[in-house]
């Protein structure tokens, strides 16, 4: 496979798994006051995508394909559940210029988002019921769920990762490690190609003076050959002229001899 195709495929893989880079999203979320809006928009679009996939899985006639699609839906839901937890932290965070009513409105948005996420069918009814009970039930009214708006910092153990999310994180780290190893191999190959190209350029630079010298010698030989041909042509013309003159003298003598013989014979 050409190196350029490998580079394009690596870029596509990096773009495909970029949204799973939790550290990157964490840095983006902490970079500005509008981190909540960005994360909310990202989660909302991901929920729409996973909902479409769940609908496809529900209409899939191939059982194996449906199971695989449901497994992917569950993994995505686990990842989005972690993002919802982050969104919840951002919702209760005090920001300059943000009123208490606006923070409460953000909390309501988080609750609605969590309800939408847990309502997505994933082929695991027991897991869905358990998840709904953990969130207070998908059908429970939002007013029964309260946020402690005075709690600014929460302990690290307040939010626990689920087993599925931990497995997905391990799988993601393993895939990213393999991709990094592949990228390192590609980088080494590119360095080798770069060194080879540099060596070829050096050899070509060394051959340039030799080629110029050869061209000079060929031009000199061509000029000498042309001059030799001109001189040879002149010699041939001169030889031909001298030979013709001698033949003419001989013929004239023969004719005069014949005429003299005839004249003497007649007398």
From Swiss-Prot:
Molecular functions (GO terms): SNAP receptor activity
Top-level taxon of the source organism: Eukaryota
Vesicular topology ranges: 266-267
Protein location: Membrane
Membrane topology of the entry: Single-pass type IV membrane protein
Gene Ontology biological-process entries: intracellular protein transport
Residue ranges occupied by any t-SNARE coiled-coil homology domain in the UniProt entry: 173-235
Keywords, ordered alphabetically: Coiled coil, Membrane, Protein transport, Transmembrane, Transmembrane helix, Transport
Primary residence: membrane
GO cellular component: membrane
Annotated InterPro entries: Syntaxin, Syntaxin/epimorphin_CS, T_SNARE_dom
Pfam family, one: SNARE
Tissue spec: Expressed in root, leaf, stem, flower and silique.
Keyword Cytoplasm: no
Membrane-spanning segments: 245-265
Coiled-coil spans in chain: 53-87
Cytoplasmic side: 1-244
PANTHER family: SYNTAXIN, SYNTAXIN-72
Role description: Vesicle trafficking protein that functions in the secretory pathway.
Subunit: Part of the t-SNARE complex.
Family per record: Belongs to the syntaxin family.
The protein's name in its UniProt record: Syntaxin-72
Organism: Arabidopsis thaliana
Origin organism lineage: Eukaryota, Viridiplantae, Streptophyta, Embryophyta, Tracheophyta
Encoding gene (name): SYP72
């Amino acid at each position: 496979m050409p190196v350029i195709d490998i580079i394009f495929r690596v870029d596509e893989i990096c773009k495909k798994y970029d949204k799973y880079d939790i550290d990157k999203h964490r840095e983006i979320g902490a970079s500005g006051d509008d981190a909540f809006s960005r994360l909310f928009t990202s989660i909302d679009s991901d929920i729409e995508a996973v909902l479409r996939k769940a609908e496809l899985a529900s209409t899939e006639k191939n059982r194996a394909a449906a199971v695989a699609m449901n497994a992917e839906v569950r993994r995505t839901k686990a990842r989005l559940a972690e993002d919802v937890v982050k969104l919840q932290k951002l919702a209760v965070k005090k920001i300059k210029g943000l009123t208490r009513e606006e923070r409460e409105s953000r909390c309501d948005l988080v609750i609605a988002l969590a309800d939408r996420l847990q309502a997505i069918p994933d082929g695991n009814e027991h897991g869905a019921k358990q998840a709904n009970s953990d969130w207070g039930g998908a059908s429970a009214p939002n007013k029964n769920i309260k946020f402690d708006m005075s709690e600014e910092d929460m302990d690290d153990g307040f939010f626990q990762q689920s087993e599925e999310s931990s497995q997905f994180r391990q799988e993601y780290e393993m895939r990213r490690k393999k991709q990094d190893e592949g990228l390192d191999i590609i980088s080494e190959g590119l360095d080798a190609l770069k060194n080879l190209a540099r060596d070829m350029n050096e050899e070509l630079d060394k051959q340039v003076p030799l080629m110029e010298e050869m061209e000079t010698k060929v031009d000199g030989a061509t000029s000498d050959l042309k001059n030799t041909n001109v001189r040879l042509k002149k010699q041939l013309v001169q030889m031909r002229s001298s030979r013709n003159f001698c033949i003419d003298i001989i013929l004239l003598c023969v004719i005069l001899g014949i005429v003299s013989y005839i004249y003497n014979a007649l007398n």
